[in-house]
């Protein structure tokens, strides 16, 4: 699905260098089809890097996807130029009267911060409440999963004593589920989190269906039966070097982090890591766009009435 983005967005040239099909707004205007409208609430500090990662995964399908970037934190960013934020991001007030086919809420480095201490916690709650009536399907990633489980289901924050960092094996529980269609029986995906997601907790306190688990019994991928919300507790969008960059950052900060599990060849940080999760990440986002967004969203977004088969 060629993603439709502003002509000047840095991701255009970045992704074209990888031979990723990106359609600029000026070119897309000549195609007489309705693109899917996908809103990305980017909570990560390095916003340009995160844009590149998610846009790469949203790009590999035959329909247009019109991307809108959203920010809810008005504080000055230390990692993203103000000019970039002003040019390519909207505020919630700009879009609260609009409807969207899809919403992606990214992770955030807030695993050890209590929810009420998050500077934009009220805004997160506002967006999630708004999405119930204005978005066909929402995908939550990593920390956003923990936030959504608290807001939507009242589940208290669950925190690990040590950070889960590395590339872990997972297995699917429902081979015919639409979100895992085409998945191998077992697959690899990266994690980088303090948040804890015991599968038993999800089963006991929600009506969500767990579709894939880690080998240790943590929930990795789960969703509502009506396809309106989906959750992925890892980082399938990560680049090959992202975990290495996080590890070196923590080393330089004197945090004495563990070497990310199953990531560096021979467990040696001097060796160049390889992405072993890329096909899984692409298939996950393609399935979400197709089965959870495109197949149930109304043609006329002025009337939000997602329909199941």
Curated annotation (Swiss-Prot):
Substrate binds at residues 163, 192, 249. GO terms for biological process: L-methionine biosynthetic process from homoserine via O-succinyl-L-homoserine and cystathionine. GO terms for molecular function: homoserine O-acetyltransferase activity; homoserine O-succinyltransferase activity. GO terms for cellular component: cytoplasm. Pathway: Amino-acid biosynthesis; L-methionine biosynthesis via de novo pathway; O-succinyl-L-homoserine from L-homoserine: step 1/1. Its main location: cytoplasm. Belongs to the MetA family. This is Homoserine O-succinyltransferase. It comes from Shigella flexneri serotype 5b (strain 8401).
């Amino acid at each position: 699905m060629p993603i439709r983005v502003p002509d000047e967005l840095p991701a255009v040239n970045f992704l074209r260098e990888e031979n990723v099909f990106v359609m600029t707004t000026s070119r897309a205007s000549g195609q007489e089809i309705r693109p899917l409208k996908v809103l990305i609430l980017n909570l990560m500090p390095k916003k340009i890097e995160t844009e590149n990662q998610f846009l790469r995964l949203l790009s590999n399908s035959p329909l247009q996807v019109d991307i809108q970037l959203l920010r809810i934190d008005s504080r000055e960013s230390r990692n993203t130029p103000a000019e970039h934020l002003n040019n390519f991001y909207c505020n919630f007030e700009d879009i609260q009267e609009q409807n969207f086919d899809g919403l992606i809420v990214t992770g955030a480095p807030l695993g050890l911060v209590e929810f009420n201490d998050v500077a934009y916690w009220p805004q997160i709650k506002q967006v999630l409440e708004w999405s119930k009536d204005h978005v066909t399907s929402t995908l939550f990633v990593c920390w956003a999963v923990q936030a959504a489980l608290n807001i939507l289901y009242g589940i208290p924050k669950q925190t690990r004593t040590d950070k889960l960092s590395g590339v872990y094996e997972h297995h699917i529980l429902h081979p015919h589920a639409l979100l895992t269609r085409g998945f191998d029986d077992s697959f690899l995906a990266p994690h980088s989190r303090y948040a804890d997601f015991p599968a038993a907790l999800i089963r006991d306190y929600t009506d969500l269906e767990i579709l894939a688990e880690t080998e240790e019994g943590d929930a990795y991928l789960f969703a509502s039966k009506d396809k309106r919300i989906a959750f992925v507790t890892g980082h399938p969008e990560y680049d090959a070097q992202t975990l290495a960059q996080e590890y070196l950052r923590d080393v330089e900060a004197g945090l004495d982090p563990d070497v990310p599990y199953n990531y560096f060849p021979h467990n040696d940080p001097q060796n160049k890591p390889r992405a072993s999760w890329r096909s899984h990440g692409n298939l996950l986002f393609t399935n979400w766009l197709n089965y959870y967004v495109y197949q149930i969203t109304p043609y006329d977004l002025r009337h939000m009435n997602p329909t199941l088969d």
